[in-house]
Structure formats: structure tokens, C-alpha cells
């Protein structure tokens, strides 16, 4: 006799299913430091998808050593600028920022996003942070960066997106010295990641507005007579007779999409600077042409085209990096049908 197993429809892991506060996703943790000092995060804008023909280098795979077709996502990654250094201290409620220093001569477009601090006392503030590190008051050093979408033709905006990135270094002094060296400078994608490495991606998914429970939670459609009584895509009950209120566990209609989603262990298949290598005939739908630096990531990434995608060192890396893949062909066929 078959075992009766009927899991609950949908998942409560992402509840409440409401719109994200911002189109800029957040990383709430950073992995342990490895290697030379560098930023642990980057950001780009989603272009679209295509496929590549590459040699399968997955160990013990049935197609190991054979040519396979792999779907990839193209993300255009113009250089980002380091705007500030922020020092954190731990207290009973967690970490809090205790000091920050802003660079001078930042891009004028940054005023579209925030009131830009003048940074007149940069040398004095840097000295104060150094003293606090020596006194043991600082628990972490991070960098405040922002994107430069004005250099992209596919993203119709000039307003930068500001975010915070961790710094990979063994100790605070090394972090602080590296942060001072890159303060106010441009950082490219090749300064942070290498081809073949694993990364985590975070983005805001495609917004779908208000949807019914069938699409939002994946409930079964009504069967037989029930479906002919005007309730094909509705739930059977809101709860028992004796309840004074409707439980939050009941699948109901509401906001669908525009949620933050983080995906782990995505592999970078290629980092390039010539957009013609990946731009299809007629350009990408709803984006256009890739003209600058870009990355090819294996598989899909949340969000529509032009959406900001954040990249981070893997916080749960399950395997070692496979190295640089052998890509034989990148499809440039038209995506317009």
C-alpha cells in the first residue's frame, strides 16, 4: 500500500510575502577571509540569458569530458567606486557603526541618492579609526561602494545604487590599510572575482502584483462539482468554525513577486570586457547592447533585465573552485524569436 504523504502547499519560509523595502538587495553576513585583501562583494545589472557550449569538468559526471550546453546569465558589471570606510563595534544588541570616513571628489550623480558628506576632516577621522583599532574598540571594517549606471546604455538611469561590502583580510589592521588604499578609487570586477570561482547572488525578483492563492501558493484547483460553483481557483476553507480569526497559515491572495532572494554557489564561467562576444543579433530584449565589462554566470539569476544583482564570496561553499572552464561557443542567436 502506498504511503499517504501530502505536504503543505507552498512554503512559509519566506513569509510574510510582501514587497521588498528597496530594489537594492542586502547581504547580512560575509564569509571568512581568504587570500590577499580585497572586497568581498560586487554589483552589476542583469542583461539576459543565453547558452554556451563547454566541456563538462564536473567530477564523476556522466558527461565528464564531453561537450554540453549550459544556460548562462549575462550581468554587465561596470566599475564601482569606494565612497567611504565604516568601522563597527559590537555591543549587546549586535554590531553598530561607530565611525566612518568619506572620500572627497565623488561623482556628482551620488547627490541624486543621498546628501554627500564633505569629507573635510578625512585625515583626522582616519587617525581616530586607527586609534580605536589599537584600543580594541573596533570589531570590523567595511567599505561603502556605489555603482555607476551612467556608463551603461541598457540601464536608463544615472542615480547610483549604494551598498556595503565586506573586506577579506586576516586582521583589522590589514583591512584598514587596504580600505584606505582603495578609498575614492574605482574597483573593477577583475579586482574582486576570478573566472571559475563560486559566488552567491542576491536580487529582487520580478514583481507580479496581487495574485490568487493558486499562483501565489500553488494550491490544487477545485475538482468536480466544486469547480463548477464559481470557486475553481479558491481555497476550500478559511479555517474551523470555532476560531476567532483567520490563521496566517491559510494560503490567501496577496502580493506575489518583488521579494529578495539569495542563491548560493553560482559559478562564474567567464569575465570579459568586449560586449560583442555575448551580444546577440538585434541586442537583448528589454536591454539592448552590452558595451563594457560583463560576467557569465551558470544558470539563472532572480529578477528581470536591468535589475541590480549583487555578488558575494560564497558563504556556504560546498566544493573547491573547479578552475577556469573550457568554453567552446557562446550563442549569439537573436532572442527576438
Swiss-Prot record:
Keyword annotations: Ribonucleoprotein, Ribosomal protein, RNA-binding, rRNA-binding
Gene3D superfamilies: 3.30.1430.10, Ribosomal protein L3, domain 3, Translation factors
Example of a GO MF term: structural constituent of ribosome
Keyword RNA-binding: yes
GO cellular component, as recorded: cytosolic large ribosomal subunit
Domain of life: Archaea
One GO process term, biological-process aspect: translation
Region (Disordered): 1-20
InterPro entries in UniProt: L3_arc_euk, Ribosomal_L3_dom_3_arc_sf, Ribosomal_uL3, Ribosomal_uL3_arc, Ribosomal_uL3_CS, Transl_B-barrel_sf
Record has Protein transport as a keyword: no
Signal peptide: none
SUPFAM superfamilies cross-referenced by the UniProt entry: Translation proteins
Family label: Belongs to the universal ribosomal protein uL3 family.
PANTHER family xref list: 60S RIBOSOMAL PROTEIN L3-RELATED, LARGE RIBOSOMAL SUBUNIT PROTEIN UL3
Cited function: One of the primary rRNA binding proteins, it binds directly near the 3'-end of the 23S rRNA, where it nucleates assembly of the 50S subunit.
Quaternary context: Part of the 50S ribosomal subunit. Forms a cluster with proteins L14 and L24e.
Protein name listed in UniProt: Large ribosomal subunit protein uL3
Organism encoding this protein: Methanosarcina barkeri (strain Fusaro / DSM 804)
Amino acid at each position: 500500500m502506498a504511503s499517504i504523504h501530502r505536504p503543505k502547499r507552498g512554503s512559509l519560509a519566506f513569509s510574510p510575502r510582501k514587497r521588498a523595502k528597496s530594489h537594492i538587495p542586502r547581504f547580512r553576513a560575509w564569509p571568512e577571509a581568504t587570500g590577499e585583501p580585497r572586497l568581498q562583494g560586487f554589483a552589476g545589472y542583469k542583461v539576459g540569458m543565453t547558452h554556451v557550449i563547454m566541456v563538462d569538468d564536473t567530477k564523476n559526471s556522466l558527461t565528464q569530458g564531453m561537450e554540453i550546453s549550459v544556460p548562462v546569465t549575462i550581468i554587465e558589471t561596470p566599475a564601482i567606486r569606494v565612497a567611504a570606510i565604516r568601522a563597527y563595534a559590537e555591543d549587546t544588541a549586535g554590531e553598530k557603526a561607530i565611525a566612518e570616513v568619506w572620500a572627497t571628489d565623488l561623482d556628482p550623480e551620488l547627490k541624486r541618492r543621498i546628501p554627500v558628506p564633505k569629507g573635510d576632516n578625512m585625515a583626522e577621522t582616519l587617525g581616530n579609526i586607527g586609534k580605536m583599532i589599537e584600543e580594541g574598540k573596533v570589531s570590523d571594517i567595511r567599505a561603502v561602494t556605489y555603482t555607476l549606471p551612467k556608463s551603461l546604455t541598457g540601464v536608463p538611469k544615472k542615480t547610483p545604487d549604494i551598498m556595503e561590502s565586506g573586506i577579506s583580510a586576516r586582521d583589522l589592521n590589514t583591512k584598514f590599510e587596504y580600505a584606505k588604499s582603495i578609498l575614492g578609487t574605482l574597483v573593477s570586477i577583475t579586482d574582486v572575482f576570478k573566472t571559475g570561482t563560486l559566488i552567491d547572488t542576491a536580487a529582487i525578483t520580478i514583481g507580479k502584483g496581487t495574485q490568487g492563492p493558486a499562483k501565489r501558493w500553488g494550491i490544487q484547483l477545485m475538482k468536480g462539482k466544486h469547480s463548477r460553483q464559481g470557486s475553481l481557483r479558491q481555497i476550500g476553507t478559511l479555517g474551523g468554525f470555532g476560531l476567532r480569526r483567520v490563521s496566517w497559515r491559510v494560503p490567501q491572495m496577496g502580493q506575489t513577486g518583488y521579494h529578495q532572494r539569495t542563491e548560493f554557489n553560482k559559478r562564474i564561467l567567464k569575465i570579459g570586457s568586449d560586449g560583442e562576444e555575448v551580444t546577440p543579433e538585434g541586442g537583448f530584449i528589454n536591454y539592448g547592447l552590452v558595451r563594457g565589462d560583463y560576467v557569465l554566470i551558470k544558470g539563472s539569476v532572480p529578477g528581470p533585465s536591468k535589475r541590480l544583482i549583487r555578488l558575494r564570496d560564497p558563504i556556504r561553499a560546498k566544493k573547491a573552485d573547479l578552475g577556469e572552464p573550457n568554453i567552446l561557443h557562446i550563442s549569439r542567436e537573436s532572442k527576438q524569436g
